[in-house]
From Swiss-Prot:
Protein name per UniProt: Elongation factor G
Top-rank taxon, per record: Bacteria
Keyword Protein biosynthesis recorded: yes
Binding site for GTP: 17-24, 81-85, 135-138
The organism of origin for this protein: Exiguobacterium sibiricum (strain DSM 17290 / CCUG 55495 / CIP 109462 / JCM 13490 / 255-15)
GTP-binding keyword on record: yes
tr-type G domain segment(s): 8-283
Family: Belongs to the TRAFAC class translation factor GTPase superfamily. Classic translation factor GTPase family. EF-G/EF-2 subfamily.
Any GO molecular function: GTPase activity
Function recorded in the entry: Catalyzes the GTP-dependent ribosomal translocation step during translation elongation. During this step, the ribosome changes from the pre-translocational (PRE) to the post-translocational (POST) state as the newly formed A-site-bound peptidyl-tRNA and P-site-bound deacylated tRNA move to the P and E sites, respectively. Catalyzes the coordinated movement of the two tRNA molecules, the mRNA and conformational changes in the ribosome.
CDD domains (UniProt xref): EF-G, EFG_III, EFG_mtEFG1_IV, EFG_mtEFG_C, EFG_mtEFG_II
Compartments it resides in: Cytoplasm
Length: 692
């Protein structure tokens, strides 16, 4: 079977934004104009095509990135809709990993918002070129040039307008294209009556010419020939300017800014044109590299159909009709339905059962996938998020994804005996889909503990259990994922000796503990000289220390960022064994409590609160009362933005508190930033509570 669209005519893009910037509506309109939907679904009516899980339609937010294939002007555009809520950053990370380009959607009233910053940073990490769509120009307080300014000020982004709006708010009725020197006037809000004229309207001519000149100057920095022509005062053609903008955008250092209102059907088709004009095809991005697991050599996989097959699984979902669906991006080669591939990450042979091309939540079966395709497979039993799939005879692993540790936990128990078994299965399936969601059973209490990235994240997990798996559960109060660490070095001598008739137990170790760098984790060094502790017992010492650190030294929370060096010890020819050394090592950790300046660490959240002016004093006082610190303030339109750092333990139920303090006019967003030492008085409370 031949491929339908060449690689050059393929775009893999993500739509990324802050919550409520209108991302799902924008994606909807793209699907509508590319002929994929025959009726437009509105998010606020709960009928959106991309938001296909029940809770998404109820809450009006996008939770799972649905991958959709659309066509525009003879090109294939694969779109991944990503969530804008901070609790779902993992979904964003996953999708950015497999995209070639992205459209960042901004709200014309707010410009860059906190989650925009998070997503923008993630996109920069993965080297994803972007164009920016300033949406909601019809909204009260919409200000295009202010939004472009926030890109420069808050993200230090080299952003340049390639369009400007005619009018704003209710008066938003047209778009001026600075590149092609055209004007588009909209006769209605349905996108059916568009008048296109050459040139700039008289009252905007001066501003448009100025902005076009500064655009050319900015683009000339990336294109030498254009720079020469510009300096010599020669005319730069539309084709040259377009090619220059494309080249500049692909450097991931230049961002074209477009404008429109997806809800009012203005500017979406022009944005689709810009996706084709300025965002990369799989051929334009650097070839992916991987490691040959047999030889440890680096392998480059070019984006061609002739190269050996390689793909990355970026999402696993449970579908009520076909079972487990694995979304994957093909980087090189081809594969057909029914064929065998290798999961090189796990060393397992897998069969690609059926291959589906997804459209929001309907699907079309396809016989084959080619380089650059994004599709979903049925029948992959052992594949999870981040795994590499490759040709059977190959053994290449592509760079995987790293996911953040959960920061919040709750205890959960089934309401009835019948729910007990179902709950275990449901949680296992949900954990398989989402790497930032963990589930474990507390060995002492037998309680099931679920952990995730925020209250909303866990709410939605419990909700999905009820809807998809018909499991009713009671949920306990949220628990914070505290950590412990040491602040001083300590040398601990620990001996375990037991004689109880017959063969005894004997293990003796001397361990030097010292603080490690923040984020460096646990590090073990063997400094034994002359075999005072035989080599075969060393791994047992390491495991003993590591296991004991997991159980905490002050309040039972995992101890992080510690270096341990085994420096001395002794053994007994008959009585020593691995178990004895493991116990001696874990006893050494227990002695750290009084000798190492042990402290408790708590997750700190970066919180941005947007409130009307008159509540400013009240909210600032509230931040301080929650042990928070204000890190900055600014005016945004007629609202005030307070940026602060607040411990997670003080943020439970904050939404309700903020609502009542501001009569429902305040909003906030938060995401995990770092761990910080807990004040002594708070630490004493935590220890007291933990030790009952």
């Amino acid at each position: 079977m031949a491929r339908e669209f060449s690689l050059k005519n393929t775009r893999n893009i993500g739509i990324m934004a802050h919550i409520d910037a209108g991302k799902t509506t924008t994606t909807e309109r793209i699907l509508y104009y590319t002929g994929r939907i025959h009726k437009i679904g509105e998010t606020h009516e709960g009928a959106s095509q991309m938001d296909w899980m029940e809770q998404e339609q109820e809450r009006g937010i996008t939770i799972t990135s649905a991958a959709t294939t659309a066509q525009w002007k003879g090109n294939r555009v694969n779109i991944i809709d990503t969530p804008g809520h901070v609790d779902f950053t993992v979904e964003v990370e996953r999708s950015l990993r497999v995209l070639d380009g992205a459209v960042a959607v901004l709200d014309a009233q707010s410009g860059v918002e906190p989650q925009t910053e998070t997503v923008w940073r993630q996109a920069t990490t993965y080297g994803v070129p972007r164009i920016v769509f300033v949406n909601k120009m019809d909204k009260i307080g919409a200000d295009f040039l202010y939004s472009v300014g926030t890109l420069r000020d808050r993200l230090q982004a080299n952003a340049h307008a390639i369009q400007i709006p005619i009018g704003a708010e209710d008066e938003f009725k047209g778009i001026i294209d600075l590149v092609e020197k055209k004007t588009y006037m909209y006769g209605n809000d349905l996108g059916t009556d568009i008048e296109e004229t050459e040139g700039f309207p008289a009252e905007f001519a001066e501003e448009a010419e100025e902005l076009r000149a500064s655009l050319i100057e900015a683009v000339a920095d990336y294109e030498e020939e254009m720079m020469m022509k510009y300096l010599e005062g020669e005319e730069i053609t539309i084709e040259e300017l377009k090619a220059g903008i494309r080249k500049a955008t692909l450097t991931v250092d230049f961002y074209p800014v477009l404008v429109g209102s997806a809800f009012k059907n203005k500017g979406v088709q022009l944005m689709l044109d810009a996706v084709l004009d300025y965002l990369p095809s799989p051929v334009d991005v650097k070839a992916i590299t991987g490691i040959n697991m047999d030889t440890d050599e680096e392998i480059v996989r070019e984006s061609t159909d002739e190269a050996p097959f390689s793909a990355l699984a970026f999402k696993v979902m449970t579908d009520p009709y076909v079972g487990k669906l694995t979304f994957f991006r093909v980087y090189s080669g081809t594969a057909s339905a029914g064929s065998y591939v290798k999961n090189s990450t796990k060393g397992k042979r897998e069969r690609l059962g059926r291959i589906l091309q997804m459209h929001a939540n309907s699907r079309e079966e396809i016989p084959m996938v080619f380089a650059g395709d994004i599709a979903a497979a049925v029948g992959l039993k052992d594949t999870t998020t981040g795994d590499t799939l490759c040709a059977e005879k190959d053994n290449v692993v592509l760079e995987s994804m790293t996911f953040p540790e959960p920061v919040i936990s709750v205890a959960i128990e089934p309401k009835t005996k019948a729910d007990q078994d179902k709950m275990g299965q449901a949680l296992a399936k949900l954990a398989e889909e989402d790497p930032t969601f963990r589930t474990e059973t507390n060995p002492e209490t037998g309680q099931t503990i679920i952990s995730g990235m925020g209250e909303l994240h866990l709410d939605i997990i419990v909700d999905r259990m009820r809807r998809e798996f018909k499991v009713e559960a009671n949920v306990g109060a949220p628990q914070v994922a505290y950590r412990e660490t040491i602040r001083q070095s300590a040398k601990i001598d620990s001996k375990f000796a037991r004689q109880s008739g017959g063969r005894g137990q004997y293990g003796h170790v001397v361990v030097e503990f010292e603080p490690n760098e923040e984020g460096a984790g646990f590090e073990f060094n063997n400094k034994i000289v002359g075999g005072v502790v035989p080599r075969e017992y060393i791994p047992a010492v390491e495991h003993g220390i590591e296991e004991a650190l997991q159980n905490g030294i002050l309040a039972g929370y995992p101890v992080v960022d510690v270096k341990a060096a085994l420096v001395f010890g002794s053994y007994h020819d008959v009585d020593s064994n691995e178990m004895a050394f493991k116990i001696a090592a874990s006893m050494a950790v227990k002695q750290l409590k009084d000798k190492s300046g042990a402290v408790i660490l708590e997750p700190m959240m970066k919180v941005e609160i947007v409130i009307p002016d008159e509540y400013m004093g009240d909210i600032m006082g509230d931040v301080t009362s929650r042990r928070g610190r204000v890190e900055g303030m600014e005016a945004r339109g007629n609202a005030q933005v307070v940026r602060s750092m607040i411990p997670l333990s003080e943020m439970f139920g904050y939404a309700t508190g903020l609502r009542s303090r501001t009569q429902g006019r305040g909003t906030y967003s938060m995401h995990f930033d770092h761990y910080e030492e807990v004040p002594k008085s708070v630490a004493e409370e935590i220890i007291k509570k933990a030790n009952g």
